[in-house]
């Protein structure tokens, strides 16, 4: 009998497949993956399979900026309070309201096998990096898990969830109503710079070669995305910008298609006021003639306090509309938004592998790209613009700009609009499409969609100065090349400055200019062409004038019951304010300039600077440290090439923090060609040659040529290695 048992065990073991260990999986991925770093440190990652390529991509990202990779996941998965303390508990709770860790794991388990492999490869790439680099000490996450990408399935900064107030979450879920500061949890910059992007798609009728072209110009925080090239033998060959920690190229191109995202004004989130009925220990809410039970989910969150790790337990609530995020009086409010992480990851990754507009359109039919528009161009000469993607159907008799009555079934979302119902521009006869986070109804001149054809909830963004700036440039353009499209995208005219200073000059005609210096400054402004440059004294005068106006409290915030638009604020300063008020505030700006710089005759480049001192997420700017003059300006002025800034703690100068970060201009033909720019450099390591090798190029608008095809990559190769090996 004993012999029979032994034989049975041997037979069972021999028939059971050996489960590959994590270490064995790492080694196999590394063997199948090659990383070639070019002369700017851009990683060109070659993998046998898509999973191998993802493994190498995440390994390379960790090499370049592990801190930001980890920080993005600490925030996304809801563990920020373990580092930042109790103030971040409600950012963590917000993440769990939409998906618990258990649900994230279930989503991973329910994903198609190919997506599971990519998620495992994501975790393997980061864990292998940590194993091979023990000198790197994570802040919190010592082992990455394959379910984590379910929390970070879309490439925007924060995505939609950032719009859910952590303060309101605290007020609802925490009986302690102290005035404790609450952190949003996002890597957010306090620079008041409009977040957004520019996307231009150019048809062959407007280009010298006859090929379609694409401008990829996201306006994001500096160093928020790296530049990568990721290739597999399974059809992946994508180049562009990747948000740290994600395994797909978010803004970029392959050999046949290119995609660029701009922020959308589509209404993709709604609030439903729930009428709560308590029956003993049971909490229900009214829905038509019935009472529905609220889902009650306990969650325990950890936070650090005085060097100790503590824990707090919350009872989370969800209705069929979404999680309860706050209360309006006695009504509990559910906040509904797109939350389909599996489908979102599928759309984000498969987007990078499409070969033509038909395939791209089919991918867009997944309809999970909720916070963005998409500008598109391809090698067939097609150009297109998709305004929004995830758009719930609604009963237009209700006003969804305000919370709606959740007890009325008629307010429920009625599924999603079909892709064909959404705003789309395809191959307009004018030969170009533009979107600068502005209205879709000026995207292609008279060939733009018509506002009256779409429900109001499909669009909300008004026209802005960037859109006003772009339209005549594109209309008048011809025989465009990569270089001339770069010049167009960096056109230095500022329509906002034109409007503001024209109003000041008009005031000087109607009201006496009292000081000698004001008279002299106004004479200088009379001859200005409203173009920004490092030598422009006029630009400095204009910025200080706007700063003085903004801090004066004179600009109205509301127009009726609506918040006044950016164009409306400029209209007030240039047209509606009295001439006397305009001149008085201009005098204040001159006095501020003299205090800060000793003279009002200060060139723009003396004031407007680029500085990168270290790899920290938040730069501690210092006027005494080296910096570069930058002849760009904020997108608030209508600058297409945006340079958003903030002051340091004790600085007189302003320093760039956002705007043009990764920029690409792409031409599609028999072969794809492109030039790119990355603010600063590829690496966050101050000792790396690629920490600041693009800084002066950034200031000088000197783009680099992209090495896309392997023969070109090899010509530019500086180091070649498998993950885990020493670079050669």
Regions found by a protein language model. Give the residues of each.
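C-terminal/peripheral segments of proteins
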Residues: 17-506, 511-514, 527-728
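A cross-family structural signal marking well-folded subdomains
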Residues: 520, 525-526
């Amino acid at each position: 009998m004993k012999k029979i048992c032994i034989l049975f065990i041997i037979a069972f073991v021999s028939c059971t497949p050996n489960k590959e260990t994590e270490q064995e999986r790492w080694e196999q991925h590394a063997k199948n993956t090659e990383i070639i770093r070019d002369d700017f440190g851009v990683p060109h990652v070659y993998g046998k399979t898509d999973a191998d390529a993802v493994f190498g991509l995440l390994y390379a990202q960790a090499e370049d900026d592990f801190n930001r990779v980890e920080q993005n996941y600490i925030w996304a998965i809801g563990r920020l309070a373990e580092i930042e303390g109790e103030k971040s508990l409600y950012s963590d709770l917000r993440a769990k309201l939409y998906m618990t860790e258990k649900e994230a794991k279930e989503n991973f388990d329910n994903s198609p096998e190919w997506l599971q492999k990519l998620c495992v490869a994501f975790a393997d790439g980061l864990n292998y990096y940590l194993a091979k680099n023990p000198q790197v000490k994570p802040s919190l996450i010592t082992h990455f898990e394959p379910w984590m990408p379910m929390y970070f399935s879309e490439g925007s900064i924060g995505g939609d969830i950032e719009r859910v107030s952590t303060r309101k979450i605290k007020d609802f879920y925490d009986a302690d109503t102290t005035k404790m500061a609450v952190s949003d949890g996002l890597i957010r910059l306090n620079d008041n710079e409009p977040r957004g992007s520019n996307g231009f798609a150019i048809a062959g009728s407007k280009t010298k070669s006859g090929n379609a072209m694409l401008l990829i110009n996201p306006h994001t925080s500096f160093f928020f995305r790296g530049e990568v090239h990721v290739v597999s033998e399974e059809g992946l060959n994508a180049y562009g910008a990747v948000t740290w920690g994600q395994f797909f190229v978010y803004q970029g191109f392959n050999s046949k298609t290119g995609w660029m995202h701009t922020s959308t004004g589509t209404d993709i989130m709604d609030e439903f006021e729930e009428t709560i009925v308590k029956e003993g220990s049971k909490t229900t809410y009214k829905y038509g003639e019935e009472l529905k039970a609220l889902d009650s989910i306990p969650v325990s969150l950890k936070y650090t306090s005085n060097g100790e790790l503590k824990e707090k337990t919350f009872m989370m609530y969800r209705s069929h509309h979404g999680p309860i995020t706050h209360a309006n009086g006695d009504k509990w409010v559910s906040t509904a938004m797109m939350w389909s992480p599996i489908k979102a990851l599928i759309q984000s990754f498969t987007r990078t592998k499409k070969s033509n507009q038909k395939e791209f359109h089919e991918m867009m039919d997944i309809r999970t790209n909720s916070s963005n528009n998409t500008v598109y161009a391809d090698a067939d000469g097609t150009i297109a613009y998709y305004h929004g993607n995830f758009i719930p159907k609604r009963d237009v008799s209700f006003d969804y700009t305000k919370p709606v009555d959740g007890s009325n079934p008629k307010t429920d979302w009625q599924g999603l609009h079909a892709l064909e119902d959404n705003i789309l521009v395809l191959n307009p006869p004018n030969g170009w499409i533009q979107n600068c986070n502005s209205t879709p109804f000026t995207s292609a001149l008279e060939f733009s969609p018509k506002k009256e054809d779409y429900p109001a909830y499909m669009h909300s963004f008004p026209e802005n100065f960037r859109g006003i700036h772009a339209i005549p440039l594109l209309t008048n353009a011809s025989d465009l090349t990569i270089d001339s499209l770069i010049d167009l995208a960096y056109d230095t005219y500022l329509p906002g400055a034109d409007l503001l200073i024209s109003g000041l000059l008009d005031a000087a005609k109607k009201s006496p200019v009292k000081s000698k210096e004001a008279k002299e400054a106004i004479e200088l402004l009379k001859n200005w062409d409203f173009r920004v440059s490092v030598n422009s004294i006029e630009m400095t005068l204009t910025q200080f004038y706007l700063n003085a106006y903004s801090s004066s409290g004179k600009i109205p915030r509301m127009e009726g019951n609506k918040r006044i638009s950016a164009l409306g604020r400029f209209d007030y300063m240039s047209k509606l304010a009295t001439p006397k008020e305009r001149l008085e505030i201009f005098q204040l700006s001159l006095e501020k300039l003299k205090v800060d710089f000793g003279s009002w005759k200060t060139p723009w480049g003396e004031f407007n600077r680029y500085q990168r001192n270290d790899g920290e997420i938040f730069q501690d700017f210092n006027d005494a440290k080296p910096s570069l003059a930058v002849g760009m300006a904020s997108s608030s002025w209508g600058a297409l090439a945006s340079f958003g800034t903030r002051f340091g703690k004790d600085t007189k100068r302003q320093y760039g923090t956002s705007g043009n970060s990764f920029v690409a201009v792409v031409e599609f033909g028999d072969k794809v060609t492109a030039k790119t720019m990355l603010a600063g450099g590829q690496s966050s390591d101050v000792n790396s040659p690629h920490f600041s090798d693009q800084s002066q190029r950034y200031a000088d608008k000197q783009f680099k040529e992209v090495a896309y095809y392997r023969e070109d990559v090899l010509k530019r190769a500086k180091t070649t290695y498998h993950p885990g090996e020493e670079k050669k």
